[in-house]
Amino acid sequence: MMEKKFIDSLQEIEEIEKSTPVEEFIPFKSTYEAIYDSAMSHSDKTAISFFLSGDDYKNSIEVTYKDLISNITRTANFFHSLGLREDDTVAFVLPNLPETHYVLWGAEAACRVFAVNSLLDAEKIRELVNATEAKAVVTMAPIIGSDLWEKVSSIATELYHTRFLIGVDITHYVPSFPETMKAEINEKIRVNMELLENIEYFDLVHEIREIDGEQLKFDRTYQEDTVSSMFCTGGTTGLPKIAQRTHRNEIFDASAVKTFSQEVFNSEAVILAGVPLFHVTGALATGLVSFMSGGSLVMTTPSGYRGQNVFSQIWNIVEHYRVTAMIGVPTVYAHLLNIPLTGQDISSLEYCMCGSAPFPTALYREFANYIDAEVIEAYGLTEGTCISSGTPPGIKEKIGSIGLR
C-alpha cells in the first residue's frame, strides 16, 4: 500500500498554491498527451475492467493501458480520416462502454467532443446535436435492450449538420451471440440508412480494428483556449445548457484532484465507476483523473449503477476487484444501506466520494457507520470543468461543508 499523504490544513493548501506555479498542474498540451504519458508508464496494467451485468462481474473484459491508448489513437485517426478537424464536433449518445472512452478521448484528440445524455428523448437529443453543429454522431448499433439506435436514427434526417452516423456494436463482448441475430442487426442498419441521404454509416468497432493505433496520423497545435469538449450542465430546467471546456481546463482539474487526493487516485487505486460518462464526474473522475494516475477502473455495466443486478452484487464486486474507492451520488449511497453485507471482505474499500447533490447529514453518518470507509464530499460544476472543491481525505468532521476554506 502507498504511504498516506494527507493534506489536512488550509495552511498546507495555501503553501502549495504559493509555491507551485500553475503550469506545474498543466504538464500536457492535450488530454491525449496526458493519457499517452500514463499509458507508457503502465502499459501492461489494467486500465478498465468491464462487464455487461452485475451477475457477470467475474467474467470481465480487461483493457490494459496499452489497449486503451491504442484504441483511443485508432479512434482519433478514424475521425481524422473522415475529414473532421479541430473546429468540428463529434457527438456521442452512448452508455458506459470502453468504446465510450475511446470516442471521448479520441474525439478530443482529433477535434472536439459533445457528450449527450443518452436518457433524453429524441427531440431533446436533436436540439442539442443541432446546437453544436455536430458533423458526426456516435451511438449504439441496434441491439435488444437498448433504444438508442431507434432514437437517434429516427431524427437523423433532422440533424442538419451531421454527415456521419457511427454505430457501436457490442456483440463482440458476447462470444456466443447468434450469427443470425447479428445478420438481423446489420439488415436493420442497412434498411435505416437507405432512407437517409447525405449521411454515411460506419461501424466503429470494425473501422478502428483496421486503423493504425501506434501513433496519431496528423499534427495538431493545442492553444490555451483550444476547446476539448462540451457537456450539458445539470440542475437546470428545460433544455440543458451546453458548456464548453478546454484541454487546459481538463488537464488542470485532473492534475489538481490527483495532487490533493493522492490517497484516492494513485497507481494502486481500483475505482468503482458507475457514474454515466455523459456527466463530467464520469468523464473526469472516473476517466481522466484515474488514467493520469495509472489506476484501474471497474466499469459496472453499460448502465452503470443502474445496470442489471449491480446493486445486489455490489459487495461481491468490491471484494472480487479489491475496490479501493467508489464514486457516486447520495441516492447511490442511500440504496447501498439496503444491501446487506453477508460475509464479503470489503476491507479494501477506503474511500466513498460523493458529489452532484448535497449529502444529507443523517445519511452521511448512517452510511459511514455501516461500512468502514471514509466518505469524502466534493462540489463542482460543469462550467468549472468538474471538481471545484473537496474535503481532503482524512478530514472527518466537515459534514455538509465542503473544502477547508
How would you describe each model-predicted region?
Residues 112-203:
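Structural core segment of the AMP-binding/adenylate-forming
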